[in-house]
C-alpha cells in the first residue's frame, strides 16, 4: 500500500490553526478516516474532504463470511465495504480495504467465547477499539504519514489545560464514551472525532444527504458484527464445541429448581427464559458458576451491588491514579453515570463504591469513570466480580 504524493505537505508556515488543530492548511494535513461503510464514518470522510483535507479512507474486513455476511447491519461485512468504496469514489479520495480477520479473531472473538464460558458478559466492541482499530489501524495511519486518524464515533476530544481530553458526546442518546474508555492518552493525541459535537443523528443524516451519499438512509449497524441475529450461544458453541455443558438451576440456598443447557445461555439479571415458572415471586439470575455448572437465581433485591472491583484500569485524569476520588460511574452502556467513589487498590486495579446500589452489575462488562461535573471521561476498567451492599 503506497501513500499518495506528499508534495502539498511541505509548504510555507501557516498563520492559523485548522479545524483539526494543526498549524497548516487542510490540503497539507493528511487524515486517515476509519470507514465502516455506515453513515457516520462516511459523513466524516465527506466532511473532511469538503473542507480540503488530504483524506484517505481505510476499511477493515473483520468478519466477512458465513452467516455474518448475510446479516444486515453487520459492521464491516461485504456490503459495508462496498458502500465505503462507493463513498470514496463519489467524493474522490483514495480508499483501502485491509484484511484483519485473523487479528480480529485472535484479539476479540476468541476472548469473547472464553469470557462467556467463564460466566462473564463481555463487550467485544471495546476490545475491538482497543486492540484493532486504535492499535493496528492507528499504526497503519502513521505508516501512511497521516497527521491524525478520524472516526465516526460520537464522542468529543477537547483541549484542556494539560492536553487533549475525552468527553461525552453532545447528544446523550448517541454518546459512545462507554465503548472508548480504554483509549490511551497517546492515542487520543492522534485521534479526531468530528461528529461528537453534533446535536443529533438527524444532523448526520442531513449532512449525508447534502453530500449526496447513498448511505444517507442506511440503518445503523449492530453492535456485535460476528453474532448473527444476536444468538451468542450458537457462535460460542461453534467456536468451542462441547464446551457448553448442561447443569442445575439453584436458588441462593443451593436448592435445585431446574436444569439448564449451559451457562453461556444466561446473563446476570436475566428473568425470562429460565424455565422455572410457577414458583411464586419472580426470580433472576444473580450468579453464574461455570466450575460447578450452576446458574444461581434469587429475588430482585439480590442483584443490588454497591462495590464494583475493576481491573485493567485505563486512567485519563490529570492527577496521578492514586488514593480515592469522587466520580460518576457507568456500569452498563445503557445506564446513566451514577455518583460513586473510586478507590485505587493496586496497579491498574481499583474498586468503585456506588453511593446507591445498582442492579445487573456483571463481570466482563466495563465500568467507566466520569468527572463529577461536566462531561469528561476519566477512564475505566473491566468488572472482575460483584459484591452486594
Curated annotation (Swiss-Prot):
Disulfide bridge partners, by residue number: 128-225
Domain of life: Bacteria
Keyword Ion transport appears in the UniProt entry: no
Region named Interaction with tRNA: 174-176
An example Gene Ontology biological process: tRNA wobble position uridine thiolation
Residues the record marks as active site: 128 (nucleophile), 225 (cysteine persulfide intermediate)
Subcellular location: Cytoplasm
Example of a GO MF term: ATP binding
A matching Pfam family: tRNA_Me_trans_M
EC number: 2.8.1.13
Site, as annotated: Interaction with tRNA: 153, 365
Annotated catalysed reactions: S-sulfanyl-L-cysteinyl-[protein] + uridine(34) in tRNA + AH2 + ATP = 2-thiouridine(34) in tRNA + L-cysteinyl-[protein] + A + AMP + diphosphate + H(+)
Any one annotated GO CC term: cytoplasm
Binding site for ATP: 34-41, 60, 152
Keywords: ATP-binding, Cytoplasm, Disulfide bond, Nucleotide-binding, RNA-binding, Transferase, tRNA processing, tRNA-binding
CDD domains (alphabetical): MnmA_TRMU-like (cd01998)
SUPFAM superfamilies according to UniProt: Adenine nucleotide alpha hydrolases-like
InterPro entries: MnmA-like, MnmA-like_C, MnmA-like_central, MnmA-like_central_sf, Rossmann-like_a/b/a_fold
Family: Belongs to the MnmA/TRMU family.
Function of the molecule: Catalyzes the 2-thiolation of uridine at the wobble position (U34) of tRNA, leading to the formation of s(2)U34.
Protein name (Swiss-Prot/TrEMBL): tRNA-specific 2-thiouridylase MnmA
